[in-house]
Amino acid sequence: KIPQTWMLVLCYFTTFGGFMALTAWFPTFWKKAMGLDPMLAGGLTAVFSILAALLRVPGGRLSDRIGGEKVSMGALALLAVAGILMNIPMGWGATFVVSLLISVAFGFNNGATMKLVPVYVSEGVGGANGWVGGLGAFGGFVFPPLMGRLVDISPQYGYGLGFLLFTFFALLVMIINYFGMIRKK
């Protein structure tokens, strides 16, 4: 009914769904793509997940101060760049640092998206939050099979290429959000 709701759904699909997807995906990535033992793979994944979850709060606070649109666009730009960087051959330590950039982007954008719901859908915040949260979480089920398919197609490059899905979605959301923000104003 309200087009901006779908803009917010896609935004949350990309970063909250992405958070869920990579929390499930990273143990396999660290073991198979980077050759790490399962304990270290689990530890790196835990740091990624905890950081993204904790950064929702400062993402929301910063959105209160400077606006959710600015925080969201900055976080999505960071995600787009980090998705590209995950394709550059580097050691596991540098790759982990880039994964933390993705975590920062996810956390900040998730906080910003929740700030934007009452801004764009003030007449139906509760219902819109249901749509944004419910359909946004669906990204957690969509991304892993797509990433797995890329590994099937190209075992050597597929793990890195999977992160380009986040680059693509981040850029798509930035474009849609830009035009959605113009329409709202």
Language-model features: locations:
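Multi-pass alpha-helical transporter architecture, strongest
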Residues: L164-K185
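Cytoplasmic membrane-interface "Motif A"-like loop-to-helix N-cap segments
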Residues: D64-L76
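Helix-to-loop junctions at the C-terminal end of transmembrane segments
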Residues: L55-G67, V151
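Intracellular juxtamembrane helix-capping segments at the cytosolic ends
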Residues: F108-V121
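A membrane-interface helix-boundary motif in multi-pass transporters
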Residues: R149-F169
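A late C-terminal transmembrane helix in Major Facilitator Superfamily
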Residues: E123-P155
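C-terminal ends and interior cores of transmembrane alpha-helices
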Residues: A77-M90
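Extracytoplasmic gate region of multi-pass secondary transporters
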Residues: I2-L54
